[in-house]
Structure formats: structure tokens, C-alpha cells
Amino acid sequence: QGKESECIDLYSRFDIRDISAKYRLFQGRLAFNERARCLMFAPSYASEIAFYAEQDDGSWMKKDSFCLGTGGFEDRISESSGFELLKDDIRNCMDACSSENYFYMLYDGTDLGHTRKIEFRYVIRFTANGVLDCVYKVNPTVRNICVSYDDSAVYVLMIGKDGEYAIGKSELSIR
């Protein structure tokens, strides 16, 4: 049975006492890179993707971050007392995974009101140390991703032409 080893408040700069509101606003996906002993936290709505390195004592230290967009979501939350998701908020991360060498994040880009139709979603690849490496365009119906250990292929769960779930595979070019 696991035990909590450390609690890190990723968004301590926001004075949100209601834990359910904080969860709604700052939920996301987590991926771990074994080789680098690094975690990537990619939030669903907030703009800052954070990378944490595991220390020798088992604690976690933030080592890098990458900002998607302008940070307008965080600015609005800082200035607001309502702490609600709005129809024009953008969903950033849908899914995240890692391979031996990289982290991958499935970027959505749709607003919560679904007022914009998207032509693509994007798989964003970061090095195991949190540096942006490349971006792949994918079908807008992709919902989940996983990548082969050697980064040669991406596997996806997507919505098929008749509305059914379908599994897809695409080869990735290795640089």
C-alpha cells in the first residue's frame, strides 16, 4: 500500500480555500520519466506545464516550466473571487505520457463553450528535462495518447467516423 511522501501545492500563489474549486481550476495530467527521475504536470486549463526532479531524499524540486498561451487564465483567477470555469476558457491538456527519452502532452485548444471548431489537436513533445522539442499535428478526434518506449510510434484512442471509439497508430520520425 502506498503512502503520501510529500505534498506540493502547485498553485499556492492563489488564495483558494475551497479545495473543490482549486481542483476544478487546476486539475491535470501527470507523467513520470524513469530515466530522468522527472515528473511532468500538465494542467487541463491553467497554462503552466511544470517539471519536477526527484531529489536523493525522495522530495521533489521544480526544475523547469513551459507556458502555453498568455497566462490569461491565471490572471483572471488572481483577480476573481468566483473561481469558476467559463465558456471561453481553453482546455489545454487532454492527456500526457512519457517514453524513455521524452514527455508527451495532447493539447486540445478548444474552448469550454465549444464555439470554435478545431482542425487539429497537437501532441507536444518535451525532453525528459522539460525542454520543448517538437510538435505533431493529430486528428481532432484524438482523445488519449501513449507512445512506444523507443519513441517510434504513437498510439491513440480516437472517435471514429461513426462515433465509435477506435485505436490508431502512427509512426513518429526520430531525430
State where each predicted segment sits:
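Short glycine/acidic-enriched loop and turn motifs that connect beta-strands
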Residues: 45-48, 110-113, 160-164
